[in-house]
């Protein structure tokens, strides 16, 4: 009998951003359309991030919240394992308490702080693993790995993953939300002879406040175009950006 439960281990925050969560939600939405029930295991959450998952109508399970430590994302040797806030062993065991009850047919992991250490603990318990990555910088042990980075090659993962793993590499495997797919034909028909519109997006969190920096720079330029900024409500200086945007258009 086919197992239609899928678990996602993913986080989002001001320093992690929203990208990992959003691509997992896109995949979960597709799976839901095909009869699967998706469960999200999330740590270091805030209310706004929780609401994103709740609105998607997927099942949400909260891992024990840890005290957030200060992370300097500009330091020369940034360690992504800091993102977990706990060791991989602790993270897995706390996740496994939910996984064991759910009994999923597949566990999806999208987290820069998780590598082969976590994966092996899962495989030892007979779990099927689907890993999402776009760094190619660490060891993995899984059944399937998806990396949609343009130009990504198998050689990039040579010696970094178990030989029997299925590799889905390159932008042909991009996870794209339905609303963007529906607009593709319209986009291809657009008149591209002149620049009339500009869209700027620095992600759902924009921890470095680049949206405001770009906006202030564009204000100094004499551009006869419509400029659209896309941002999440967790973006820094949200109200200041809204006020400045009215001066640009």
Map each language-model feature to its residues.
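Short N-terminal targeting/anchoring amphipathic segment
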Residues: 85, 96-113
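Conserved nucleotide-sugar phosphate-binding/catalytic loop shared by glycosyltransferases and other
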Residues: 34-92
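Nucleotide-activated donor-binding/catalytic signature segment of Leloir-type glycosyltransferases, i.e.
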Residues: 239-249
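A conserved mid-protein helix/loop that constitutes part of the nucleotide-sugar donor-binding site
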Residues: 22, 205-218
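A conserved nucleotide-sugar
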Residues: 216-233, 237-240
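Short amphipathic alpha-helix
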Residues: 21-31
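A nucleotide-sugar donor-handling region in carbohydrate enzymes
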Residues: 141-209, 232-234, 238-239
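Nucleotide-activated donor-dependent transferases that construct or modify glycoconjugates
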Residues: 3-17
């Amino acid at each position: 009998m086919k197992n239609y439960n899928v678990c996602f281990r993913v986080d989002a925050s001001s320093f992690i951003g929203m990208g990992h969560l959003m691509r997992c939600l896109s995949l979960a939405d597709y799976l839901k359309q095909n009869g699967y029930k998706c469960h999200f295991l999330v740590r270091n959450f805030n209310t706004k991030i929780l609401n994103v998952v709740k609105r998607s109508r997927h099942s949400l399970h909260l891992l024990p919240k840890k005290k957030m430590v200060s992370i300097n994302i500009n330091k020369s040797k940034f360690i992504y394992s800091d993102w977990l806030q706990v060791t991989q062993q602790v993270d897995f065991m706390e996740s496994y308490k939910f996984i064991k009850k759910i009994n999923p047919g597949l566990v999806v992991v999208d987290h820069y702080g998780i590598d082969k250490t976590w994966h092996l603990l899962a495989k030892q318990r007979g779990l099927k693993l689907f890993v999402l990555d776009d760094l190619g910088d660490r060891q993995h042990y899984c059944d399937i790995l998806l990396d949609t980075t343009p130009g990504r090659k198998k050689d990039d993962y040579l010696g970094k993953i178990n030989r029997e793993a299925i590799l889905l590499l390159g932008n042909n495997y991009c996870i794209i939300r339905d609303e963007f797919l529906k607009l593709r034909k319209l986009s291809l028909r657009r008149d591209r002879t002149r620049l009339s519109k500009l869209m700027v997006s620095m992600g759902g969190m924009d921890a470095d406040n680049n949206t405001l920096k770009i906006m202030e720079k564009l204000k100094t330029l004499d551009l006869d175009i419509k400029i659209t900024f896309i941002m999440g409500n967790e973006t820094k200086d949200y109200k200041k950006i809204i006020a400045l945007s009215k001066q640009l258009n």
